[in-house]
Amino acid sequence: MPKFALVCAGTWLTAADELTTATIMPSVARDIGGYAWFGWAVAAFLLGSILGGATAGRLSVRFGLRPALTVGGGVYALGCAASALSPSIGWFLLGRLLQGLGGGWVVGLCYVAVSSLFPQSMWARVFSALAGVWGAATLVSPLIGGLFAEAGVWRGAFWLFAAQGLAFIVAGALLIRPGAGAAEPQGERPPYAQVLVLTLAVVAIGAAGLWPTGGEAAVSAIVGLALLGLFLRLDARASARLLPRSAGDPRTVAGAGLLMIFCLQAATIAFSVYGSALLQTLHHARPILAGYILGGSAFAWTAAALGVAGRGPDVLFIRLGTGVIGLALIGLALTIPHGPLPVIVVCVMAQGAGFGLAWSFSAARIVANTPEPERAFASSSMPTAQLIGAAVGAAAAGAIANLLGFGHGVTTARASLAGFWLFASFVPLAAVGWLAALRLTASGASGATLTGSA
């Protein structure tokens, strides 16, 4: 039981961190002047999570599970402390990057710990419980963030999570035996080159909102997109990959499915980044209420996924779910500026429900139609594509918001303008995601490609 609590606690750190931070970001910006960096705060955390997740297994193999968890928890706690102490937005972003890196290590190592600490007969139940931790975080973290924001002590939220990170380190040292999880180091190196190029791509896209002219912003965005293409090319040729080799080819099932995940995640992340600020400014929502509205998407995702679990046909749920996501995005563009608030809540929950309807069926179809040697990559690449999409989308949302003047401070007029364009601008990307879903569910989707070619 104590070891079960340990892996749940490690998962909780990242699960609760994201929504807590989203809830308090308006308070952070008012205090240290970070309105221009909203998107970067999310993107930095996600980039750290990608690198941490990609190297967690190797960390365990090289040093053993207990030292690896100590390093992960320590880096996470250090990041929380840096965010709590930050005198400026630059230090805050560094803290968020360290939180993402440490949190990515901790979550990845907790999944490694399941196979090391529990008999195989218990794996399914433990993994189900870890999924439940994410649901619990949806209910609790808006309350945590809201209470600290309303008390005017947002830094206290990060001190709270720093303390939890340190407690996790102590518990891991007491509960995990020395040498657990260690093995002979693997020959291949972690995907550092791909993560570096991906980081540069996200920075270039996010920087588009910081240039003084539209021409410079366009060049920055184009460079970012070109670097994304280079990332896919490098990853396909690397021995240590983040994605299947076919990820860049939408004619394949894996390529179409991962494109769908990337586009829809990138298209919808803007509400997670700016939703709290927009709701507080335009609709006078208290931080706690704004946080729970943000969490409504995750709650609806879970409820919809449970409602359709084991049912079919999968084609219907994939197409319906992805279509609902696009319609919800249009609904947010129309209702965020002027309300009413109950309709906004409906749109937020519809967006989450769309993901819940489509996700498990999409995952099953991607894995089932991927060649056997690539199936491990296909399984692990779906959350990776989700993180990459969220990081790119957060950077793009930040660029759009800054081009609309959001970086100079949040006024009602600026919030109303941003409230429309932050969602309307991503509707075409959501449409691409829906078209990719149609390719994923094409009647001829069998084997490795949708066209039947090798």
Give each language-model segment a name.
Residues 22, 108, 129, 134-146, ...:
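Glycine/proline-centered helix-kink
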Residues 79, 84, 95, 102, ...:
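Small-residue hotspots
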Residues 89, 183-184, 209-214, 309-311, ...:
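Membrane-interface helix caps and helix-loop-helix hairpins in membrane proteins
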Residues 5-8, 74, 132, 194-203, ...:
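Alpha-helical transmembrane segments
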Residues 150-259:
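Hydrophobic transmembrane-helix bundles of small-molecule transporters
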